UniProtKB/Swiss-Prot annotation:
Disulfide bonds: none
Protein purpose: Binds and presumably selects ubiquitin-conjugates for destruction.
Lineage, broadest ranks: Eukaryota, Metazoa, Spiralia, Lophotrochozoa, Platyhelminthes
GO molecular function, one term: polyubiquitin modification-dependent protein binding
The protein's name in its UniProt record: 26S proteasome non-ATPase regulatory subunit 4
GO cellular component: a single term: nucleus
Family assignment from sequence similarity: Belongs to the proteasome subunit S5A family.
Region described as Disordered: 392-420
UniProt feature, compositional bias: Basic and acidic residues: 407-420
UniProt KW keywords: Proteasome, Repeat
InterPro entries xrefs: PSMD4, PSMD4_RAZUL-like, UIM_dom, VWF_A, vWFA_dom_sf
Single GO biological process annotation from the record: proteasome-mediated ubiquitin-dependent protein catabolic process
UIM domain location: 210-229, 255-274, 288-307
Ranges for domain VWFA: 1-174
Length: 420
């Protein structure tokens, strides 16, 4: 697109204190100026923008491509006095004639929020001169529509001439949002409405992507994360949901985008792993008596093993602390040692000797798998009939497997003795 030099003339009269545009006319005007600056910069980065006040006809900021300077000067504007329309437009034209890039087209964007004191003849003479100098003027009329509508319409018609294009008059009714109205107007969207489409996502969230790309990218990522979370809640089936690679909008830096996608995928995998690692409910009613007995014995042995696997701490007189698992025999010096209890362990763990004595030995296992011992344990359980055929089969199976293991162990010890 062609390059353009634009002077934005803002109304800073006392009428701008009115609250028919939320929160005030002045604040609504400032938001609209920010929108126009963003659209101009999005169309062409070589566009330059200046700022002028109508009440005291002061050039607040000369032509620049640094939008932050416009914002800084704009927030210093205070309402006072009345506007001088014709003199302000002439000064804006003079500032445009002194632009550095002569090939830039000249345009004035003027906000009118108070009555215009000049008569129609003076406005017509000014319009003819601007047309001769090839200066386009866009006027946003808000707040005082009935008073200024006729004058401004003739002014714009004189500027456009027979072509009828180039300059625009936008009248905004009180009570509406000035920023939203300009979004679809020719001032921002252009003659054919392609200005906003060409700007892409630059005006998303009301931010200029060229000014703060990191903040814009963070907002996009946050919105995408929220969208994924909502879709996950709608689908519902968290256990059957597979991890899908997230497609995020293009941002500043592909490496950061890839890391973010990886982090989101890992987070979803961790959630699925945590849900799958939880113990499943056991339906005891669906199990046979033999399976119930085997399950009860297995849980009892597992609980006993967990209680005896806590580490113990042995403190030697040489100020060396050795942490070792319970039940592991170690060859140490005959130097007198002192056994201390780890304060982090429960009081029931006791000393090292007490902990090692809790580990089941081969003799203890023989007793546990003894048929009479199992019958006595099962008789103490409510609802268990030891004379039941299934119960007898389960006891015989457990004792038989233990006896087979013991015989194999004895055969191995005999072979080792013969080899030695």
């Amino acid at each position: 697109m062609s390059q353009e030099a634009t002077i934005i003339a803002v109304d800073n009269s006392d009428y701008m204190r009115n609250g028919d545009f939320f929160p005030t006319r002045l604040q609504a005007q400032n938001d609209a100026v920010g929108l126009i600056c963003q659209s101009k910069r999005q169309r062409n980065p070589e566009n330059t923008i200046g700022l002028l006040s109508l009440a005291n006809t002061e050039v607040l900021c000369t032509l620049t491509n640094d939008v932050s300077k416009i914002y800084n000067r704009l927030h210093l504007v205070e309402p006072k006095g009345r506007i001088i329309f014709c003199s302000s437009i002439r000064i804006a034209h003079l500032a445009l004639r002194h632009r550095q890039l002569r090939h830039q087209k000249m345009r004035i964007v003027c906000f009118i929020g108070s009555p215009i004191l000049e008569d129609e003849k003076e406005l017509t003479r000014l319009a003819k001169r601007l047309k001769k100098e090839k200066v386009n003027v866009d006027i946003i009329n808000f707040g005082e529509n009935e008073t200024n509508e006729q004058k401004l319409s003739e002014f714009i018609d004189t500027l456009n001439g027979k072509d009828g294009t180039g300059s625009h008059l936008i009248s905004v009714a009180p009570g509406t949002v000035l920023h939203d109205t300009l979004m679809t107007s020719p001032v921002v969207a252009g003659e054919d409405g392609s200005g906003m489409a060409g700007a892409g996502l630059g005006l998303e969230f009301g931010l200029d992507g060229a000014e703060d790309p990191d903040l814009l990218y963070a907002l996009r990522v946050s919105m995408e994360d929220q969208r994924m979370r909502q879709e996950h809640e709608v689908n519902g089936d968290g256990s059957n949901t597979s991890v899908v690679a997230t497609s995020l909008p293009a941002g500043s830096g592909t490496s950061e985008e890839a890391m973010l996608q990886q982090a989101l995928a890992m987070s979803m995998q961790m959630n699925n792993t945590e849900s799958s690692s939880l113990p499943m409910d056991i339906d005891l009613a669906a199990m046979s008596e033999e399976d119930q007995i085997a399950y009860a014995l297995r849980m009892s042995l597992q609980q006993m093993g967990e209680e005896t696997t806590q580490p113990t701490t042995t403190t030697l007189e040489s100020d060396k602390t050795i942490v070792e698992p319970s039940g592991v025999a170690m060859d140490i010096d005959q130097t007198p040692t002192k056994v201390t209890e780890n304060p982090n362990l429960s009081s029931s763990s006791g000393t090292l000797a007490a902990a090692t004595s809790a580990v089941p030995t081969s003799a203890d296992l023989d007793v546990m798998y003894d048929a009479e011992f199992l019958e006595s344990v099962l008789q103490s359980l409510p609802g268990v009939d030891t004379q039941n055929e299934d119960v007898r089969k389960a006891i015989n199976a457990l004792t038989k497997s233990q006896s087979q293991r013991g015989s194999k162990k004895d055969e191995k010890e005999d072979e080792d003795k013969q080899n030695s």
